[in-house]
Amino acid sequence: MPAPRGLLRATFLVLVAFGLLLHIDFSDATNMTSSTNVPTSTSSRNTVESTTSSEPTTETNMTTARESSVHDARNDEIMKVLAILFYIVTGTSIFSFIAVLIAVVYSSCCKHPGRFRFADEEAVNLLDDTDDSGGSSPFGSGSRRGSQIPAGFCSSSPYQRLETRDWDEEEEASAARERMKHDPENVIYFRKDGNLDTSFVNPNYGRGSPLTIESHLSDNEEDPIRYYVSVYDELTASEMEEPSNSTSWQIPKLMKVAMQPVSLRDPEYD
């Protein structure tokens, strides 16, 4: 994931920077020690060569040794401080890496289920309009003709507002498609054979994935038409401007096939 990778890269750069600082400090300490020792050897050589006086030579050697010991003590203190800083930075980086790793593992293991998960009973309620006795369903009450989900149901439910129609004339269907370009609705059109003709999905509907119903006919004419409920990504207005027939038009990004097929007694025609 991007967050742990960036943290590792930052930790690595910090460690490299501290390593360079330690290397530079060691080099400076070595140069200063060698430059301080040169006068000592020179003064010792001068002491051997000059025999005029022994007391000044002894004092010079003691002063040089004292300065060298003071410089070594300062170097030791600097090294201790740098070592403490190095351990602090390293420990903090390791702790941060472990914390991020734990957070990533926890979030990946505790993902909540998808927002749109439909049970089989919900699919039946969504797709089945009425029974023979004229009972009500989310699509409304009475006949299947011209049925649609009421506005109140849509406001309190993740289901799309759907409307199914069948057009007898191509001119009327073309006029409807032209209207959809300017004012798209959540509409699904079926042909009389039960196959999906054209599906329009409102791009302004919510922020979740739209619900789309597709119909499929089997080779056996006695079998009922099977409707599949699938959850797709939202369509943009530009993607909806030129819908074609069902053989070539594909909805952009299938998010989830919600459930097994649901059989209806009759197709949803207008």
Curated annotation (Swiss-Prot):
Membrane topology note: Single-pass membrane protein
Coiled coil: none
InterPro entries per record: UL132 (IPR021023)
Pfam families: gpUL132 (PF11359)
Stretch forming the signal peptide: 1-29
TM ranges: 84-104
Comp. bias intervals (Low complexity): 33-67, 133-147
Cystine crosslinks: none
Compartments where located: Virion membrane
Alphabetical keyword list: Glycoprotein, Membrane, Signal, Transmembrane, Transmembrane helix, Viral envelope protein, Virion
UniProt protein name: Envelope glycoprotein UL132
Source organism of this protein record: Human cytomegalovirus (strain AD169)
